[in-house]
Amino acid sequence: MLHGYLSNKESFAPQIEYFSKFYRVTAPDFPGMGGANALGCPFSVSDYADWTERFLEEQGIKNPLVIAHSFGGRVAVKLLARGRVDKAVLTGCAGIVRKRTLRYKMKVRAYRIVKKLAPKYAEKHFGSAEYRTLSPVMRESYKKIVNEDLREEAKTIERPVLFVCGTEDRETPLSSAQIYHACVKDSRLLVLEKCGHFAHIENPLAFNAAAEEFFS
């Protein structure tokens, strides 16, 4: 199980409890997150995928069934494209860069101007609250991650994938899941009503049942 950005394996508590009845469940914390060691240098999505491959090899795991959320979905897309995964359930899967609005572009331009004149002010008042809490290394990693669009890699995936999206998800909206679904030829799309970005936690019964059926 591959967790979301700045999250940890505990975010999969309902899935770990449920699937441990049927499978050997492994849920690592990504480097720089949860209880893992801090990053020594900025990681890209590919770097995290490389790390995950090494982790799987160390654990003696081949062709795993994967459940991934948000950022973990980015890593899973890389692994799927490399043929390292048997099947995957990706919920709230990130990796589709949305078209930038005029407002966003103006905000970026303003940030660049203010950063030159008053860097401390820019750091305090621009960017998401999440971004402002990151260490310098994690900030550089974050930039690498969020600016990479994974559509082309998704098109190369030949393994079965179930995409799950909540109707109220604002972080990775249904439109992103639909794009992924169109890119991956052997894929399904499950939409969970009245769920947001954490559909696997908000409706674990429906999510677990769908994942179990998909994996069987």
Question: Residues of each region from the PLM?
Answer:
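Catalytic histidine neighborhood in serine/cysteine hydrolases
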Residues: 181-198
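Conserved alpha/beta-hydrolase catalytic His-Asp/Glu region
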Residues: 100-159
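Conserved alpha/beta-hydrolase "acid-adjacent" motif
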Residues: 170-176
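Catalytic histidine-centered segment of alpha/beta-hydrolase-like enzymes
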Residues: 195-208
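Flexible "cap/lid" loop of the alpha/beta hydrolase fold
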Residues: 74-117
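Short beta-strand/loop motif that positions the catalytic acidic residue
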Residues: 156-157, 163-165, 169
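Active-site loop/oxyanion-hole signature of alpha/beta-hydrolase fold enzymes
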Residues: 13, 26-67, 209
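Conserved HGGG/HGGXW glycine-rich cap/lid loop of the alpha/beta-hydrolase fold
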Residues: 1-35
